[in-house]
Swiss-Prot record:
Role summary: Catalyzes the synthesis of the hydroxymethylpyrimidine phosphate (HMP-P) moiety of thiamine from aminoimidazole ribotide (AIR) in a radical S-adenosyl-L-methionine (SAM)-dependent reaction.
Keyword entries, A-Z: 4Fe-4S, Iron, Iron-sulfur, Lyase, Metal-binding, S-adenosyl-L-methionine, Thiamine biosynthesis, Zinc
UniProt catalytic activity: 5-amino-1-(5-phospho-beta-D-ribosyl)imidazole + S-adenosyl-L-methionine = 4-amino-2-methyl-5-(phosphooxymethyl)pyrimidine + CO + 5'-deoxyadenosine + formate + L-methionine + 3 H(+)
Pathway: Cofactor biosynthesis; thiamine diphosphate biosynthesis
Gene: thiC
Phylogenetic placement of the source organism: Bacteria, Pseudomonadati, Pseudomonadota, Betaproteobacteria, Neisseriales
Cofactor stoichiometry and binding remark: Binds 1 [4Fe-4S] cluster per subunit. The cluster is coordinated with 3 cysteines and an exchangeable S-adenosyl-L-methionine.
InterPro entries linked: ThiC, ThiC-associated_dom, ThiC/Bza_core_dom, ThiC/BzaA/B
Protein name: Phosphomethylpyrimidine synthase
Length: 633
């Protein structure tokens, strides 16, 4: 896959840029020797994607051994399907529309409900930026609740629940019955710390999904205005997911570049995307992203609300924020980060911190509380927020506005006071049947990471935990994808459901596309390490397949099975670029005479030969005895 061309910060001709990007995307998404395939659900319109990596045969002295294809979880959407026609100006296919219609509990509104949304729709200055396929928004009918949590508590298995059950299972229940996968599916026992991890793929059923959602332990972020979505699940008892961030600022990025970053993030495996835009044309940029996003999109609505006040936190009002929530919900945002736990009485607790309040949303609300000496309006209006959320099935991501910004401040009084308030708000949201996940730190030394998970499980009643790392040391600017990846792997093992990626540019500047790639790959491996540690069924399949390819010097399969095939091959080719090196039984690290795996194979061949010789000697001995044990006849 080729690295994307640099996109101009702004050319003034987004339509031309988007057309060029549409033509180029298919080329970029070619995965080596693999294809996107679909598993059929109980109805024709439940087609669940996965990617199958095809392997080369193994050649031995005894003949040829076929290696089976390896299924992997796939987030690429239609961008990873060579057969799909991609036109960003048209958006993605609406795969959920029939499901929404059949439930009969939503209505198509005659027009937008948000004042700001209406204003933007009629602003001639932004006409050239608007997505040209705008549809009228849906909302729950009066007195109806349309959340996945509500359905789950009613005992209803929705198509979304069936979809994610098939997606999590990856057809491993079928493969476990096939002899060619027997050795590849062996894995170490996990340590799940009390989680209800399935022990076999056939336990990952739509009913299992429904129960986990009904209990509040998992969420399916799926706004009714995001019909393009391929449903996914976030929960302690499922695969660990990762989030990638994007967003423009006042000084960088164009609309096209943000769409490109979204697609680029999907290419490397982001399960969800958060649009953290704070610059111009936030509304229009978000529309383009959602209409072309097969994964859930999250936002921090207070950022846009602040932009509407000209950046003056004191001028924020509940009415302004409420209109922003409705605006974004009607566009199709799947989850909102809302910093409702930053209470007025908690702000003084941060005074003696080394780095104070580092959350942008947390600092905005703290400043508002102090300026007005009133309680956080997100807290006092929380029930009204829930009414909006359940009308569109937007999930809460309850923000950790008082998260520690350095390891010195980790696990302090203010952090856990806010966490306990988030637990209170979780209970309140659940009374409305609104889905909830909880955001977590941050910066935490390794020995104190588990305490964060324990506190969250106890005080937030096992709602899914969603953490930013945590970074386990503060001495490595430029390498914070690693400092945070260490913490992420650990807290994922302890029970965190989703990890928010960190790039090498953390604390230093806005990430470019290569930084995004590095951040996502780092977090994919952290999430995978957590899945292995907690014993997710089938998690070790890809590891075993790659290890077998490595031992058999199937270099191309090693590249194909890796998280970043392009980089793995480029590193190999830096020293051994010749085509013949792809079949050589050594690499540049040890050379042909000192390769441990080559020597091991020779030892095995020798042992097999010795075994055959011993067996031949034993057979001759038996024959000698049977003939009377006479030396001479």
């Amino acid at each position: 896959m080729t690295t994307p061309k640099k996109t101009a910060k702004t050319s003034g001709n987004e339509a031309r840029e988007l057309a060029d990007l549409s033509e180029d995307i298919g080329i970029r998404f070619k995965y080596p020797n693999s294809e996107r395939v679909y598993l059929q659900g109980s109805r024709d319109d439940i087609r669940v994607p996965l990617r199958e990596i095809r392997q080369d045969d193994t050649y031995t002295a005894q003949g040829t051994e076929a290696n089976p294809p390896i299924p992997v979880y796939d987030t690429s959407g239609v961008y990873g399907d060579p057969a799909a026609h991609i036109d960003l100006k048209q958006g993605l296919p609406h795969i959920r529309t029939a499901w929404l219609d059949e439930r009969g509990d939503t209505e198509i509104l005659p027009k937008l409900s948000s004042e700001y949304g209406i204003e933007r729709a009629h602003d001639p200055k932004t006409a050239h930026l608007r997505f040209n396929q705008i549809t009228r928004p849906r909302r729950a009918k009066a007195g109806r609740n349309v959340t996945q949590l509500h359905y789950a508590r009613q005992g209803i298995i929705t198509p979304e629940m069936e979809f994610v059950a098939i997606r999590e299972r990856l057809k491993l229940d079928e493969l476990s019955q096939k002899p060619e996968y027997a050795k590849l599916l062996k894995q170490h026992a996990g340590q799940s710390f009390g989680a209800n991890i399935p022990t076999h793929p056939d336990q990952i059923t739509p009913e299992f999904v429904r129960r986990e959602i009904a209990a509040g332990r998992a969420i399916i972020p799926a706004n009714i205005n995001h019909p393009e979505l391929e449903p996914m699940i976030i929960g302690r008892n499922f695969r660990v997911k990762i989030n990638g961030n994007l967003g423009n600022s006042a000084v960088t990025s164009s609309l096209t570049e943000e769409v490109e970053k979204m697609v680029w993030s999907l290419r490397w495996g982001a399960d969800t995307i958060m649009d953290l835009s704070t610059g111009a044309h936030i509304h229009e940029t978000r529309e383009w992203i959602i209409r072309n996003a097969p994964v859930p999109i999250g936002t921090v609505p207070i950022y846009q609300a602040l932009e509407k006040t000209g950046g003056i936190a004191e001028d924020l009002t509940w009415d302004l924020f409420r209109d922003t929530l409705i605006e974004q919900a009607e566009q199709g945002v799947d989850y909102f980060t809302i910093h409702a736990g930053v209470l007025l009485r908690y702000v003084p607790m941060t005074a003696n911190r080394l780095t104070g309040i580092v959350s942008r949303g947390g600092s905005i609300m703290a400043k508002w509380c102090l300026a007005h000496h009133r309680e956080n309006f997100l807290y006092t209006h929380f029930d009204e927020i829930c009414e909006i959320m359940k009308a569109y099935d937007v999930s809460f991501s309850l923000g950790d506005g008082l998260r520690p910004g350095c390891i010195a401040d980790a696990n302090d009084e203010s952090q856990f006071a806010e966490l306990h308030t988030l637990g209170e708000l979780t209970s309140k949201a659940w009374k409305h049947d609104v889905q909830v996940m909880i955001e977590g730190p941050g910066h935490v030394p390794l020995q104190r990471v588990k305490e964060n998970m324990t506190e969250e499980l106890q005080h937030c009643f096992e709602a899914p935990f969603y953490t930013l790392g945590p970074l386990v040391t503060d001495i490595a600017p430029g390498y914070d994808h690693i400092t945070s990846g260490i913490g992420a792997a650990n807290i994922g093992w302890y029970g965190t459901a989703m990890l928010c990626y960190v790039t090498p540019k953390e604390h230093l500047g806005l990430p470019d596309k290569e930084d995004v790639r590095t951040g996502i790959i780092t977090y994919k491996l952290a999430a995978h390490a957590a899945d292995l540690a907690k014993g997710w069924p089938g998690a070790q399949l890809r590891d075993n397949a790659l290890s077998k390819a490595r031992f058999e010097f199937r270099w191309r399969d090693q590249f194909r099975l890796s998280l970043d095939p392009e980089r793995a091959e480029s590193f190999h080719d830096e020293t051994l670029p010749a085509e013949g090196a792809k079949i050589a039984h050594f690499c540049s690290m040890c050379g042909p005479k000192f390769c441990s795996m080559k020597i091991t194979q020779e030892v095995r061949d020798y042992a097999d030969k010795q075994k055959a010789q011993r067996q031949g000697m034993e057979e001759k001995a038996v024959e000698f005895v049977k003939k009377g044990a006479k030396i001479y006849s």
